[in-house]
């Protein structure tokens, strides 16, 4: 369909098995009021997770959640490792661990940790940050300079012999710029359609426009899925001990 020609490449799934309706980013969510009171600049690098000033002010999801996994992979990457060479990630976590107050296991618990003032900084999704900001709570989202990890809202028709043509049409409908704008405003999803126009207050909270979309990085899920069980056991021994 012609609509697929105006989508960002990052939403295209290899083998055309599905497509991303939009995307969110994993990066820093921080309490702007707290940072302002302290006179701190917004965080800008993954390695700042180890900054001693954040002692017991940091919340990170467990590795069983996607955001915690992204932390490990990105710390490996920015310290000379990768998904296939994860040791630098665990090594970097040794310096991060003293800063971690809690490992909230769900979005609700992460929101609670931030809203209670127990923590002032976390690694979280841009969409989650939008939802929290929409309540009036003073948070902002930062794309680390080395890249924020993209997380897609994927969609595909059910593969069956009598699949309705309407399923494809419904997916294509969702890529119309005006519908993409609704996804951005209500769900915090960065628009897949390059021609989508967003209101400034929405645009600043989602991955939007060539500059921000270019800051998104994808992780290698094929490698991660093979190693995840081992990494989880090691994380529980070394990080969440």
Predicted regions, residues:
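A bilobed periplasmic-binding-protein/Venus flytrap-type ligand-binding module shared by bacterial periplasmic
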Residues: 29-34, 74-78, 152-164, 182-183
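A ligand-binding cleft/hinge motif common to bilobed small-molecule-binding domains
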Residues: 115, 120-138
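Periplasmic-binding protein-like
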Residues: 90-96, 103-104, 135-159
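Extracytoplasmic ligand-binding site segments that recognize negatively charged/polar headgroups
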Residues: 1-115
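Short, hydrophobic alpha-helical packing/hinge segments within bilobed ligand-binding/sensory domains
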Residues: 46, 110-111, 129, 167, ...
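Mature extracytoplasmic/periplasmic domains
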Residues: 158-216
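Ligand-binding "clamshell"
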Residues: 9-16, 131-143
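Conserved C-terminal helix/tail region of periplasmic/extracytoplasmic solute-binding proteins
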Residues: 214-241
């Amino acid at each position: 369909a012609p609509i697929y020609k105006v989508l960002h490449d990052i939403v295209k799934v290899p083998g055309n098995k599905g497509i991303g309706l939009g995307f969110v980013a994993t990066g820093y969510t921080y309490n702007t009021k707290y940072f302002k009171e302290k006179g701190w600049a917004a965080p800008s690098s993954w390695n700042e997770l180890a900054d001693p000033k954040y002692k017991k002010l940091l919340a990170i999801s467990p590795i069983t959640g996607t955001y915690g996994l992204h932390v490990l992979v990105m710390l490996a990457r920015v310290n000379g490792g990768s998904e296939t060479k994860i040791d630098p990630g665990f090594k970097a976590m040794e310096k991060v661990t003293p800063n971690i107050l809690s490992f909230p296991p769900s979005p609700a618990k992460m929101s609670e940790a931030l809203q209670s003032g127990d923590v002032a900084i976390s690694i979280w999704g841009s969409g989650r940050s939008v939802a929290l900001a929409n309540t009036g709570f003073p948070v902002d989202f930062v794309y680390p300079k080395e890249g924020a990890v993209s997380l897609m809202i994927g969609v595909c028709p059910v593969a069956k012999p009598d699949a309705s043509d309407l399923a494809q049409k419904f997916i294509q409908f969702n890529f119309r710029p005006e519908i993409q704008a609704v996804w951005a405003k209500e769900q915090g999803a960065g628009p897949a359609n390059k021609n989508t126009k967003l209101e400034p207050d929405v645009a600043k909270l989602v991955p939007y426009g060539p500059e921000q979309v270019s800051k998104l990085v994808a992780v290698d899920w094929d490698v991660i899925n093979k190693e995840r069980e081992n990494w989880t056991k090691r994380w529980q021994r070394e990080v969440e001990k």
